[in-house]
């Protein structure tokens, strides 16, 4: 088992990682335990009561964080004609069709999010093996295949997060930076939970949100008592 560094040990001193806390306390303790000198990212992991091997239990979606994510998001837009000018006017870092696909085939990947208009998806499919594994492939289910590129770009820039459960039924998402403080992190977490709850599959049985943990880039995972999540949402 790997040994943790001195900063990590000092930060977690007095923190019982076996205890499950309220959502508010878990966030506060996670922020207080962030050991690094840089502004760490705060993340959440949520274990859902779904079986992703069944397509009707795959939970996938997107949410625009009300308090942003505290980082610059570089957006690439696959589009043609007038849409290219619209994309650049809306704040896209790069926009185009054939020439953009060719550039990516050559190894260029200097962007964080990708959007495409429906009419160029056949072209984008040529680089699916490049974009897919990196989570960059535009997808209609998450609103990144659309003719309304202005709205999509603005949402991306504002802190839009796409998520889906992994094979174990766990969903991971960033909530912002440690410097945000508890209030802004909790606001983003509430928006995420609201969205995930709306996406609950009708075929999912039993407890939907089975476990949750809050962590920072270099910090420990602080567990949340799942029975208190509803109280947090309604509070």
UniProtKB/Swiss-Prot annotation:
Coiled coil: none
Pfam family, one: Ribosomal_L1
NCBIfam families: rplA_bact (TIGR01169)
Biological process, per Gene Ontology: regulation of translation; translation
One function term, GO molecular function aspect: structural constituent of ribosome
Role this protein plays: Binds directly to 23S rRNA. The L1 stalk is quite mobile in the ribosome, and is involved in E site tRNA release. Protein L1 is also a translational repressor protein, it controls the translation of the L11 operon by binding to its mRNA.
Quaternary structure (record): Part of the 50S ribosomal subunit.
Protein name, entry field: Large ribosomal subunit protein uL1
Organism encoding this protein: Nitratidesulfovibrio vulgaris (strain ATCC 29579 / DSM 644 / CCUG 34227 / NCIMB 8303 / VKM B-1760 / Hildenborough)
Family annotation (HAMAP family): Ribosomal_uL1_B (MF_01318_B)
Similarity annotation: Belongs to the universal ribosomal protein uL1 family.
Disulphide bridges: none
Encoding gene per record: rplA
Keywords recorded for this protein, A-Z: Repressor, Ribonucleoprotein, Ribosomal protein, RNA-binding, rRNA-binding, Translation regulation, tRNA-binding
GO annotation, cellular component aspect: cytosolic large ribosomal subunit
